[in-house]
Amino acid sequence: MITDVQLAIFSNVLGVFLFLLVVAYHYINANTGKSSPKAK
């Protein structure tokens, strides 16, 4: 069975990964949105 400590570590790692994924998505989305009008 999964212990409380293992569950806490898993949830923390998953939370950090999802947070970084959201930050990376917004960073990429913001850069492509600003650079497209300049190229045109």
From Swiss-Prot:
The chain crosses the membrane at residues 5-25. It is found in: Endoplasmic reticulum membrane. Its main location: endoplasmic reticulum. It holds the Pfam family Ost4. Residues 26-40 are cytoplasmic. One of its GO terms (biological process) is protein N-linked glycosylation. Residues 1-4 are lumenal. It is a single-pass type III membrane protein. It comes from the Eukaryota. InterPro entries: Oligosaccaryltransferase, OST4, Ost4p_sf. One of its GO terms (cellular component) is oligosaccharyltransferase complex. Keywords: Endoplasmic reticulum, Membrane, Signal-anchor, Transmembrane, Transmembrane helix. The keyword Nucleotide-binding does not apply. Belongs to the OST4 family. Subunit of the oligosaccharyl transferase (OST) complex that catalyzes the initial transfer of a defined glycan (Glc(3)Man(9)GlcNAc(2) in eukaryotes) from the lipid carrier dolichol-pyrophosphate to an asparagine residue within an Asn-X-Ser/Thr consensus motif in nascent polypeptide chains, the first step in protein N-glycosylation. N-glycosylation occurs cotranslationally and the complex associates with the Sec61 complex at the channel-forming translocon complex that mediates protein translocation across the endoplasmic reticulum (ER). All subunits are required for a maximal enzyme activity. Component of the oligosaccharyltransferase (OST) complex. This is Dolichyl-diphosphooligosaccharide--protein glycosyltransferase subunit 4. The lineage of its organism: Eukaryota, Metazoa, Ecdysozoa, Arthropoda, Hexapoda.
